[in-house]
Design a protein with these regions (language model features):
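Nucleotidyltransferase catalytic core that binds NTPs
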Residues: 1-147
Length: 147
């Protein structure tokens, strides 16, 4: 069976993530990488939930065959260890800071073989509000200190 890889850098699983997982399942056995706390801080922000909690949330969707740690933003180690046939990601990484990560995936796919499948980004007002509240909460040092 083909190996399908996607990676999440999130505390909340929303409609867009579920769309990605459902699309990934069409192509084979789904591996979901969860960025470790260190990787999230380096890339995006301080996580609101622990790494273990974030892994459990993805497992509980029932849409992932394997949930694994992704220690780095770039996918080199993913390709060395999992050797995915497909990488599935939202198409929101074509521009902005994530463009570099996409380039890394494309380079690895050329090297190892495989295909990139980009799912149309899910724009949702509820998700925007959740993200804004999370960023606001994480801006408070007393909250971060409890972690």
């Amino acid at each position: 069976m083909a190996k399908v890889y996607t990676c999440f850098c999130t505390d909340v699983i929303h409609e867009g993530h579920l769309n990605i997982l459902r699309e990934a399942a069409k192509y084979g056995e789904v591996y979901v990488g969860i960025l470790t706390d260190r990787a999230m801080v380096c890339f995006n922000r301080f996580p609101a939930l622990s790494f273990e909690e974030r892994m459990e949330i993805v497992k509980n969707t029932g849409l992932a065959d394997h949930v694994v740690a992704q220690d780095e933003i770039l996918y080199d180690k993913v390709f060395e260890t999992i050797k995915p046939d497909y990488v599935v990601h939202g198409d929101n990484w074509k521009e902005g800071p994530e463009r570099m990560i996409r380039g890394n995936v494309v380079d690895n796919l050329k090297r190892y073989g495989g295909e990139l499948i980009e799912v149309p980004y899910t724009y949702n007002e509820t998700v925007k509000k959740i993200d804004a509240r999370m960023k606001e909460k994480l801006a408070m040092p007393e909250y971060r200190r409890r972690r």
